[in-house]
Design a protein with these regions (language model features):
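Short glycine-rich, Thr/Ser-proximal phosphate-binding strand/loop in the N-terminal lobe
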Residues: 1-42, 83-94
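Conserved active-site "lid/cap" helical segment
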Residues: 16, 33-64
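Glycine-rich phosphate-binding/catalytic subdomain of phosphoryl-transfer
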Residues: 53-114
């Protein structure tokens, strides 16, 4: 998944070679609200489920595993019941202008858990 699109890709192995086939592509932009930019986590989940259903239908239900590849600078916090505590902010949100997000995240996590 990237900042503007995501896709579900099937990896096929014939015993000697791995080939990749795109099964589903979807738009993946942010959602603006109150001068902030968020990820639409529920839409992303729905798109991924659609792609996995298409993959299962295309390959006779033979989906053996699932992996996710993403830029990975954003995060959502989960509560004790594994519920999402709030809408994840998009890394292109104005609060990140000129900042080194990875360093900020590490600093915040240290302060929360130490």
């Amino acid at each position: 998944m990237g900042a503007s699109s995501g896709r579900v890709v099937a990896g096929l192995f014939d015993g000697q070679r791995i080939t990749l086939e795109e099964v589903h592509r979807f738009s993946n932009g942010g959602v603006a609200a109150n001068d902030r930019l968020y990820w639409d986590a529920l839409a992303l989940w729905a798109h991924l489920q659609d792609g996995l259903r298409k993959a299962a239908a295309s390959y006779s239900g033979r989906v053996a595993s699932v992996g996710v590849d993403t830029w990975g600078v954003d995060y959502g916090l989960l509560g004790p019941g594994d519920e999402l505590l709030g809408d994840p902010r998009h890394y292109r949100d104005p609060r990140t202008d000129g900042r080194r997000i990875g360093e900020d995240i590490r600093r915040n996590l240290r302060s929360w858990f130490n």
